[in-house]
Amino acid sequence: KFQTNNHIVGYGRPYMAALAGSVGDENALYEYLTKTCGFSMAGACGVLANICVESTYDPTNVTGRYYGICQWGDDRLRNMKNYCIQNGYSPDSFQGQVSFMVYELADYPELVTFLKTATDPQLAAQEFCAGYERAVDSSGAGAKYTGNLYPARRKNSYQALKKRMNEAERLFQSKG
């Protein structure tokens, strides 16, 4: 792998800015999600909003027993660390964590299909939160999920769901 213009390039690796916790990460991840992964603008903004709320794009963010850009915990955290090590990344790297997230999204084909065709960034933020993040708010203080992909989860409240939705809309407006 080599560095060029603040980007890291390598076989099968995300091509994005090598800056942690910055607007550079937001913009580079947006480009990666739309151009490489094929997500729509709204779908990419929904993912970005969740990562922003979870960790402000900081791959070393710790909240209790949760870690990284998507605040993985328990088995998923172990899986992320093992994946990164086995694929030549530091588990603390933005690139490694994004690569793991995309790898793990293969287990969510309906969500990926939705993110590729989404036109509503707020709905994309909800679907990513309920489907991938699974950030259930047991206190009941979060907003209720009103999406369509996971009807059994409509009874659940999700942590900072309104904030995720508002951030997705803000990002969508700024990218449009």
Question: How does the language model describe each region?
Answer:
Residues G46-C52, D58-P59, G68-G73, Q97-E104, ...:
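Structural recognition of the beta-strand scaffold that forms the well-ordered cores
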Residues R13-T56:
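Export/targeting segments at the very N-terminus of extracytoplasmic proteins
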Residues C37-L48, P59-T63, E110-A124, G140:
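Surface-exposed patches in mature extracellular/periplasmic domains of secreted proteins
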Residues T34, N61, G96:
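Functionally constrained cores in energy, signaling, and assembly domains
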Residues G64-N82:
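Substrate-binding/active-site groove segments that recognize
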Residues K1-V23, K81-G96, V102-G176:
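Non-catalytic cell-wall polysaccharide-engagement segments
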Residues C52-P59, R76, P109, V136:
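Short alpha-helix boundary/capping elements
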